[in-house]
Amino acid sequence: MSPEHRRVMRSRQIFVTASAVFCVVGTLFGTGVIGTRVAESAGGDLAADATLIAPAGTAFSIWSLIYLGLLAYTIRQWLTPFADTPRHRVTAGLAAISMILNALWLLVTQVGWIGLSVLVIVALLLTLGLLAARLLDRPEPGISEFVVVDGTFGLYLGWVCVAVCANIAAALVGWGLPSEGALAVTATIVVLAVVVAVAWFLGRRLGGNWFVAAGITWGLVWVGVARLTDEPESVPVGIASLAAAAAVLFVTWRGSQERPADRLARGNHRDYGNHGDHGNHGNGRGGEPRPVGPGAPDATASTRPTPPTAAPAGPGPAPSPAGPAAEPVPPPAGAEPAPGASTEPDRPRES
Protein backbone atom coordinates (compact mmCIF):
# COMPACT_ATOMS: atom_id res chain seq x y z
CA MET A 1 0.00 0.00 0.00
CA SER A 2 1.43 3.35 -1.04
CA PRO A 3 1.81 6.17 1.52
CA GLU A 4 -0.82 8.22 -0.31
CA HIS A 5 -3.30 5.35 -0.25
CA ARG A 6 -2.65 4.79 3.45
CA ARG A 7 -3.16 8.49 4.15
CA VAL A 8 -6.55 8.48 2.38
CA MET A 9 -7.62 5.37 4.29
CA ARG A 10 -6.59 6.88 7.62
CA SER A 11 -8.44 10.13 6.85
CA ARG A 12 -11.57 8.13 6.06
CA GLN A 13 -11.35 6.24 9.35
CA ILE A 14 -10.89 9.45 11.34
CA PHE A 15 -13.83 11.11 9.56
CA VAL A 16 -16.15 8.22 10.39
CA THR A 17 -14.98 8.13 14.00
CA ALA A 18 -15.37 11.89 14.50
CA SER A 19 -18.88 11.68 13.02
CA ALA A 20 -19.75 8.88 15.44
CA VAL A 21 -18.54 10.98 18.39
CA PHE A 22 -20.67 13.90 17.19
CA CYS A 23 -23.63 11.51 16.90
CA VAL A 24 -23.12 10.44 20.52
CA VAL A 25 -23.14 14.08 21.65
CA GLY A 26 -26.39 14.70 19.79
CA THR A 27 -27.91 11.57 21.31
CA LEU A 28 -27.03 12.77 24.82
CA PHE A 29 -29.05 15.89 24.09
CA GLY A 30 -31.94 13.98 22.52
CA THR A 31 -32.28 11.53 25.40
CA GLY A 32 -32.29 14.29 28.00
CA VAL A 33 -28.93 13.46 29.56
CA ILE A 34 -27.56 16.95 28.86
CA GLY A 35 -30.57 18.50 27.17
CA THR A 36 -34.31 18.16 26.62
CA ARG A 37 -35.84 14.89 25.52
CA VAL A 38 -37.08 14.87 21.93
CA ALA A 39 -40.67 14.28 23.03
CA GLU A 40 -40.54 17.46 25.13
CA SER A 41 -38.66 19.65 22.65
CA ALA A 42 -40.16 21.90 19.97
CA GLY A 43 -43.15 22.63 22.20
CA GLY A 44 -44.13 18.96 22.34
CA ASP A 45 -44.80 18.79 18.59
CA LEU A 46 -42.69 15.62 18.35
CA ALA A 47 -44.38 13.76 21.20
CA ALA A 48 -46.03 10.38 20.64
CA ASP A 49 -49.50 11.94 20.98
CA ALA A 50 -48.87 15.08 18.94
CA THR A 51 -50.11 13.81 15.56
CA LEU A 52 -52.05 10.91 14.12
CA ILE A 53 -48.94 9.45 12.49
CA ALA A 54 -46.69 9.65 15.55
CA PRO A 55 -45.60 6.13 16.66
CA ALA A 56 -46.05 4.96 20.24
CA GLY A 57 -43.11 5.59 22.55
CA THR A 58 -42.06 1.93 22.47
CA ALA A 59 -41.25 2.26 18.76
CA PHE A 60 -38.24 4.44 19.53
CA SER A 61 -36.46 1.50 21.16
CA ILE A 62 -35.29 0.61 17.64
CA TRP A 63 -32.66 3.31 18.12
CA SER A 64 -30.88 1.01 20.57
CA LEU A 65 -30.22 -1.46 17.73
CA ILE A 66 -29.30 1.29 15.28
CA TYR A 67 -26.84 2.97 17.65
CA LEU A 68 -25.31 -0.38 18.57
CA GLY A 69 -24.83 -1.11 14.88
CA LEU A 70 -23.27 2.30 14.26
CA LEU A 71 -20.84 1.71 17.12
CA ALA A 72 -19.91 -1.71 15.71
CA TYR A 73 -19.50 -0.18 12.25
CA THR A 74 -17.18 2.53 13.57
CA ILE A 75 -14.99 0.05 15.44
CA ARG A 76 -15.00 -2.47 12.60
CA GLN A 77 -13.68 0.01 10.03
CA TRP A 78 -10.44 0.25 12.03
CA LEU A 79 -9.78 -3.48 11.64
CA THR A 80 -7.35 -4.35 8.85
CA PRO A 81 -9.56 -6.79 6.85
CA PHE A 82 -12.36 -4.22 6.57
CA ALA A 83 -10.54 -0.88 6.50
CA ASP A 84 -10.11 -0.64 2.73
CA THR A 85 -12.68 -2.89 1.09
CA PRO A 86 -14.45 -1.63 -2.06
CA ARG A 87 -17.76 -1.46 -0.19
CA HIS A 88 -16.29 0.58 2.63
CA ARG A 89 -14.56 3.00 0.30
CA VAL A 90 -17.82 3.97 -1.44
CA THR A 91 -20.05 4.02 1.66
CA ALA A 92 -17.90 5.33 4.53
CA GLY A 93 -18.46 8.98 3.61
CA LEU A 94 -22.23 8.52 3.40
CA ALA A 95 -22.26 6.62 6.70
CA ALA A 96 -20.39 9.48 8.37
CA ILE A 97 -22.74 12.08 6.87
CA SER A 98 -25.75 10.12 8.14
CA MET A 99 -24.40 10.25 11.69
CA ILE A 100 -23.72 13.97 11.39
CA LEU A 101 -27.26 14.61 10.12
CA ASN A 102 -28.69 12.49 12.92
CA ALA A 103 -26.91 14.57 15.56
CA LEU A 104 -27.78 17.79 13.75
CA TRP A 105 -31.48 16.87 13.78
CA LEU A 106 -31.39 16.29 17.53
CA LEU A 107 -29.65 19.63 18.11
CA VAL A 108 -32.04 21.53 15.82
CA THR A 109 -35.09 20.19 17.64
CA GLN A 110 -33.54 21.26 20.95
CA VAL A 111 -33.99 24.90 19.96
CA GLY A 112 -37.46 24.33 18.49
CA TRP A 113 -36.59 24.77 14.81
CA ILE A 114 -39.16 22.25 13.64
CA GLY A 115 -39.16 23.51 10.03
CA LEU A 116 -35.40 23.16 9.70
CA SER A 117 -35.62 19.70 11.26
CA VAL A 118 -37.75 18.62 8.28
CA LEU A 119 -35.00 19.61 5.86
CA VAL A 120 -32.40 17.78 7.94
CA ILE A 121 -34.36 14.53 8.15
CA VAL A 122 -35.16 14.61 4.41
CA ALA A 123 -31.42 14.99 3.73
CA LEU A 124 -30.83 12.04 6.07
CA LEU A 125 -33.36 9.94 4.16
CA LEU A 126 -31.70 10.69 0.82
CA THR A 127 -28.25 9.94 2.24
CA LEU A 128 -29.32 6.57 3.60
CA GLY A 129 -31.12 5.70 0.37
CA LEU A 130 -27.97 6.37 -1.66
CA LEU A 131 -25.88 4.39 0.81
CA ALA A 132 -28.21 1.38 0.57
CA ALA A 133 -28.08 1.52 -3.23
CA ARG A 134 -24.28 1.54 -3.20
CA LEU A 135 -24.21 -1.44 -0.87
CA LEU A 136 -26.44 -3.38 -3.26
CA ASP A 137 -24.21 -2.56 -6.24
CA ARG A 138 -21.17 -4.13 -4.55
CA PRO A 139 -20.27 -7.84 -4.28
CA GLU A 140 -22.15 -10.01 -1.80
CA PRO A 141 -20.80 -9.41 1.72
CA GLY A 142 -19.80 -11.92 4.36
CA ILE A 143 -22.00 -12.60 7.37
CA SER A 144 -20.40 -9.96 9.60
CA GLU A 145 -20.58 -7.36 6.83
CA PHE A 146 -24.19 -8.29 6.17
CA VAL A 147 -25.23 -7.88 9.80
CA VAL A 148 -23.13 -4.88 10.84
CA VAL A 149 -23.33 -2.83 7.63
CA ASP A 150 -26.40 -3.92 5.66
CA GLY A 151 -28.40 -4.63 8.81
CA THR A 152 -27.59 -1.39 10.58
CA PHE A 153 -28.16 0.96 7.67
CA GLY A 154 -31.16 -1.03 6.44
CA LEU A 155 -32.97 -0.61 9.77
CA TYR A 156 -31.82 2.99 9.87
CA LEU A 157 -33.27 3.73 6.42
CA GLY A 158 -36.53 1.91 7.14
CA TRP A 159 -37.14 3.76 10.38
CA VAL A 160 -36.33 7.15 8.85
CA CYS A 161 -38.92 6.49 6.11
CA VAL A 162 -41.59 6.58 8.83
CA ALA A 163 -39.89 9.25 10.94
CA VAL A 164 -39.77 11.74 8.07
CA CYS A 165 -43.57 11.48 7.69
CA ALA A 166 -44.08 11.99 11.43
CA ASN A 167 -41.69 14.94 11.36
CA ILE A 168 -43.53 16.64 8.49
CA ALA A 169 -46.87 16.07 10.22
CA ALA A 170 -45.48 17.57 13.44
CA ALA A 171 -44.28 20.64 11.53
CA LEU A 172 -47.68 21.12 9.90
CA VAL A 173 -49.47 20.85 13.24
CA GLY A 174 -46.98 23.26 14.76
CA TRP A 175 -47.83 25.74 12.00
CA GLY A 176 -51.52 25.59 12.86
CA LEU A 177 -53.03 22.70 10.90
CA PRO A 178 -55.48 20.52 12.86
CA SER A 179 -54.11 17.33 14.41
CA GLU A 180 -57.53 15.64 14.52
CA GLY A 181 -60.72 15.58 12.52
CA ALA A 182 -61.74 14.30 9.10
CA LEU A 183 -59.09 16.29 7.23
CA ALA A 184 -56.29 15.05 9.49
CA VAL A 185 -57.48 11.44 9.21
CA THR A 186 -57.68 11.62 5.41
CA ALA A 187 -54.28 13.27 5.11
CA THR A 188 -52.71 10.66 7.40
CA ILE A 189 -54.12 7.76 5.39
CA VAL A 190 -52.77 9.35 2.20
CA VAL A 191 -49.34 9.65 3.83
CA LEU A 192 -49.48 5.98 4.83
CA ALA A 193 -50.15 5.10 1.19
CA VAL A 194 -47.09 7.15 0.23
CA VAL A 195 -45.01 5.16 2.73
CA VAL A 196 -46.14 1.93 1.08
CA ALA A 197 -45.24 3.37 -2.34
CA VAL A 198 -41.77 4.27 -1.05
CA ALA A 199 -41.40 0.74 0.31
CA TRP A 200 -42.43 -0.65 -3.08
CA PHE A 201 -39.81 1.49 -4.82
CA LEU A 202 -37.12 0.47 -2.33
CA GLY A 203 -38.17 -3.16 -2.66
CA ARG A 204 -37.60 -3.03 -6.41
CA ARG A 205 -34.44 -0.96 -6.28
CA LEU A 206 -32.84 -2.79 -3.35
CA GLY A 207 -34.02 -6.27 -4.27
CA GLY A 208 -36.35 -6.82 -1.33
CA ASN A 209 -34.15 -5.59 1.53
CA TRP A 210 -35.73 -7.13 4.61
CA PHE A 211 -33.80 -4.88 6.99
CA VAL A 212 -35.39 -1.83 5.38
CA ALA A 213 -38.79 -3.52 5.46
CA ALA A 214 -38.32 -4.36 9.15
CA GLY A 215 -37.62 -0.72 10.00
CA ILE A 216 -40.66 0.54 8.07
CA THR A 217 -42.95 -2.19 9.39
CA TRP A 218 -41.83 -1.60 12.97
CA GLY A 219 -42.72 2.07 12.74
CA LEU A 220 -46.09 1.49 11.04
CA VAL A 221 -47.17 -1.18 13.51
CA TRP A 222 -46.52 1.14 16.43
CA VAL A 223 -48.40 3.94 14.69
CA GLY A 224 -51.35 1.57 14.47
CA VAL A 225 -51.03 0.50 18.10
CA ALA A 226 -50.86 4.12 19.24
CA ARG A 227 -53.98 5.13 17.31
CA LEU A 228 -55.98 2.15 18.54
CA THR A 229 -54.94 2.31 22.19
CA ASP A 230 -53.79 5.85 22.93
CA GLU A 231 -54.54 9.49 22.23
CA PRO A 232 -55.25 10.85 19.72
CA GLU A 233 -57.37 7.80 19.02
CA SER A 234 -58.39 7.04 15.44
CA VAL A 235 -59.62 3.62 14.42
CA PRO A 236 -59.41 4.35 10.67
CA VAL A 237 -55.78 5.47 10.97
CA GLY A 238 -54.96 2.52 13.24
CA ILE A 239 -56.38 -0.01 10.79
CA ALA A 240 -54.78 1.75 7.82
CA SER A 241 -51.39 1.70 9.58
CA LEU A 242 -51.54 -2.04 10.22
CA ALA A 243 -52.71 -2.66 6.65
CA ALA A 244 -49.82 -0.52 5.39
CA ALA A 245 -47.39 -2.59 7.47
CA ALA A 246 -48.71 -5.78 5.87
CA ALA A 247 -48.48 -4.18 2.42
CA VAL A 248 -44.83 -3.25 3.06
CA LEU A 249 -44.00 -6.87 3.83
CA PHE A 250 -45.81 -8.00 0.68
CA VAL A 251 -44.08 -5.57 -1.70
CA THR A 252 -40.73 -6.43 -0.11
CA TRP A 253 -41.39 -10.11 -0.68
CA ARG A 254 -42.26 -9.39 -4.30
CA GLY A 255 -39.05 -7.44 -4.68
CA SER A 256 -37.04 -10.30 -3.22
CA GLN A 257 -38.44 -12.66 -5.88
CA GLU A 258 -37.03 -10.58 -8.71
CA ARG A 259 -33.93 -12.05 -10.27
CA PRO A 260 -30.71 -10.09 -9.78
CA ALA A 261 -30.19 -10.11 -13.56
CA ASP A 262 -33.48 -8.25 -14.02
CA ARG A 263 -32.47 -5.58 -11.53
CA LEU A 264 -29.08 -5.27 -13.24
CA ALA A 265 -30.72 -4.92 -16.64
CA ARG A 266 -32.98 -2.20 -15.28
CA GLY A 267 -29.97 -0.42 -13.81
CA ASN A 268 -28.07 -0.67 -17.10
CA HIS A 269 -31.02 0.84 -18.93
CA ARG A 270 -30.94 3.81 -16.58
CA ASP A 271 -27.17 4.16 -16.82
CA TYR A 272 -26.85 3.94 -20.59
CA GLY A 273 -30.22 5.15 -21.78
CA ASN A 274 -28.70 8.25 -23.39
CA HIS A 275 -25.82 6.58 -25.19
CA GLY A 276 -27.57 6.29 -28.53
CA ASP A 277 -28.10 2.51 -28.59
CA HIS A 278 -31.20 2.33 -26.38
CA GLY A 279 -29.28 1.10 -23.37
CA ASN A 280 -27.31 -1.61 -25.18
CA HIS A 281 -24.00 0.01 -24.40
CA GLY A 282 -21.27 -2.13 -25.86
CA ASN A 283 -23.75 -4.41 -27.61
CA GLY A 284 -24.55 -5.01 -31.22
CA ARG A 285 -27.77 -4.45 -33.08
CA GLY A 286 -30.80 -5.63 -31.12
CA GLY A 287 -28.84 -5.90 -27.88
CA GLU A 288 -26.79 -8.92 -28.95
CA PRO A 289 -23.31 -8.85 -27.46
CA ARG A 290 -20.46 -8.11 -29.82
CA PRO A 291 -17.60 -10.60 -29.86
CA VAL A 292 -14.65 -9.57 -27.74
CA GLY A 293 -11.05 -10.68 -27.97
CA PRO A 294 -8.37 -11.32 -30.59
CA GLY A 295 -9.77 -11.57 -34.08
CA ALA A 296 -13.05 -9.86 -33.16
CA PRO A 297 -14.25 -7.26 -35.63
CA ASP A 298 -13.80 -3.65 -34.71
CA ALA A 299 -17.10 -2.33 -33.32
CA THR A 300 -16.48 1.00 -35.04
CA ALA A 301 -15.68 -0.46 -38.46
CA SER A 302 -18.13 0.12 -41.30
CA THR A 303 -20.12 -2.84 -42.56
CA ARG A 304 -20.57 -1.40 -46.09
CA PRO A 305 -19.03 -3.36 -48.98
CA THR A 306 -15.55 -2.20 -49.89
CA PRO A 307 -15.21 -0.96 -53.51
CA PRO A 308 -12.60 -2.66 -55.74
CA THR A 309 -9.14 -1.30 -55.31
CA ALA A 310 -7.22 0.17 -58.18
CA ALA A 311 -4.61 -1.96 -59.90
CA PRO A 312 -1.12 -1.46 -58.52
CA ALA A 313 1.29 0.43 -60.68
CA GLY A 314 4.32 -1.37 -62.05
CA PRO A 315 5.18 -4.31 -64.30
CA GLY A 316 3.00 -7.34 -64.49
CA PRO A 317 -0.55 -7.92 -65.64
CA ALA A 318 -3.29 -5.99 -63.85
CA PRO A 319 -5.91 -8.12 -62.12
CA SER A 320 -9.28 -8.14 -63.78
CA PRO A 321 -11.99 -6.57 -61.63
CA ALA A 322 -14.43 -9.17 -62.88
CA GLY A 323 -12.47 -12.11 -61.52
CA PRO A 324 -9.89 -14.54 -62.99
CA ALA A 325 -8.74 -13.99 -66.60
CA ALA A 326 -10.77 -15.75 -69.31
CA GLU A 327 -9.23 -18.37 -71.63
CA PRO A 328 -8.01 -16.89 -74.98
CA VAL A 329 -10.51 -17.40 -77.79
CA PRO A 330 -8.93 -18.88 -80.96
CA PRO A 331 -9.52 -16.93 -84.18
CA PRO A 332 -12.09 -18.27 -86.61
CA ALA A 333 -10.91 -20.82 -89.12
CA GLY A 334 -9.37 -19.22 -92.18
CA ALA A 335 -8.87 -15.85 -90.57
CA GLU A 336 -5.48 -14.23 -90.99
CA PRO A 337 -3.62 -13.16 -87.90
CA ALA A 338 -3.38 -9.48 -87.17
CA PRO A 339 -0.20 -7.76 -88.31
CA GLY A 340 2.56 -8.20 -85.78
CA ALA A 341 0.69 -10.88 -83.85
CA SER A 342 2.62 -13.97 -82.84
CA THR A 343 1.44 -17.27 -84.20
CA GLU A 344 3.18 -19.27 -81.49
CA PRO A 345 1.25 -20.46 -78.45
CA ASP A 346 1.81 -18.59 -75.19
CA ARG A 347 4.59 -19.99 -73.06
CA PRO A 348 4.73 -19.64 -69.32
CA ARG A 349 6.96 -16.84 -68.19
CA GLU A 350 10.07 -17.68 -66.33
CA SER A 351 10.19 -16.18 -62.94
Please give the residue ranges for each predicted region.
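Short aromatic-rich membrane-water interface segments that cap or initiate transmembrane helices
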Residues: 46-62, 147-156, 176-187
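Membrane-interface capping segments at transmembrane-helix boundaries
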Residues: 8, 79-80, 134-139, 251-269
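Central hydrophobic cores of alpha-helical transmembrane segments
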Residues: 210-221
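Alpha-helical transmembrane segments of multi-pass membrane proteins
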Residues: 20-38
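Membrane-interface helix caps and helix-loop-helix hairpins in membrane proteins
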Residues: 104-118, 175-182, 202-206, 228-234
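Alpha-helical transmembrane segments of multi-pass integral membrane proteins
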Residues: 18-26, 94-105, 123-131, 149-167, ...
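Membrane-interface transmembrane-helix boundary segments in multi-pass integral membrane proteins
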Residues: 54-59, 179-195, 224-249
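Internal transmembrane alpha-helix with an interfacial aromatic "cap," most often the third helix
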Residues: 68-88, 92, 96-118, 122-145
